[in-house]
């Protein structure tokens, strides 16, 4: 039977984590819109964001910008009178690139933002990362950081696999992942890049936690998570 202390710890975890997640969204939403909009305008003028939501990547595959524009503009164009907490929960957005790009350009011309709509989800975790990062380093800088994070997560996973079951197994896992997928194009689709970083880093973390007993079956489970 679980002790009272363990029950209390789990209860605190179950209550505390959602509150922490909400607090992070509120903090991201509190960043003034103009810091994000100036960066988006610069990216549009530099050709880093276009009206079409889908483009062709370096590897020749289709790059999904649809979700990217929606997530980068979460919290932008909030209706007047909406407080920060309500805005964070309801997650207003300018939408996909077809609507977000013209809206940003209209704002740059001195017009008011219109056309935002509610993009409610359980938790817009990508907005927690994208909104402050875009405001700080711009879209191009965010893509560079995404590429670095992807490389680091992939290296961490392959290193843990090599330590557990050998370099051949790590190669058999890494080669298909890196050479036969659109991995190289992921920084051009930031939402998918974040998801891949979490997946790879999570699998590497799993192998680190069980490093004393990691065998082929454990590595297979970690690979399946990818």
Locate predicted features.
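Start-transfer (signal-anchor) and selected internal transmembrane alpha helices
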Residues: 1-30, 217
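Alpha-helical transmembrane signal-anchor/signal-peptide segments
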Residues: 27-48
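Extended, hydrophilic extramembrane loops/domains of integral membrane proteins
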Residues: 116-123, 129
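Juxtamembrane segments of multi-pass membrane glycosylation machinery
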Residues: 128-146
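Transmembrane-helix motifs of polytopic, lipid-linked glycan transferases
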Residues: 147-168
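Short hydrophobic alpha-helices at membrane interfaces in multi-pass membrane enzymes
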Residues: 169-174, 205-226
